[in-house]
Amino acid sequence: MEKDAKIYVAGHKGMVGSAICRALQRNGYTNIITRSHKELDLCRQDAVEEFFSREKPDYVFLAAAKVGGIMANSEALADFMYENMILEMNVIHAAWQNNCKKLMFLGSSCIYPRMAPQPMKESCLLTSELEKTNEAYALAKISGLK
């Protein structure tokens, strides 16, 4: 990436997104764009389209997600699947529409089968049953990858 490229980090307040921002800054990237959930609701297609149309990021790191523990994932399956799929599709589509050079979508270890051999390999994806407690989140992540 060019040092002066416009880089949007979605999910910059989370563990992974904040680490991406720190790594970019440490490596001399200064044109990093971030928005809090209050400033930009990634589940609202109109807001995402307007943001991408105005900002025109060259590169996008998609680290944003609705996350929760075992209890939250178990009690709100549909919410986790819906919100994650919507925000992923909104960002991926807006990046494509606005000629983003590259988009990095981040997965999770939970997208792999519950009993995947260690170390996990990409070829294990969708080969057997997912962990039930985060299946909805995992399926949303897999749909973004595919």
Give residue spans per PLM region.
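N-terminal Rossmann-like NAD(P)+-binding domain of SDR-like oxidoreductases, especially those catalyzing
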Residues: 1-146
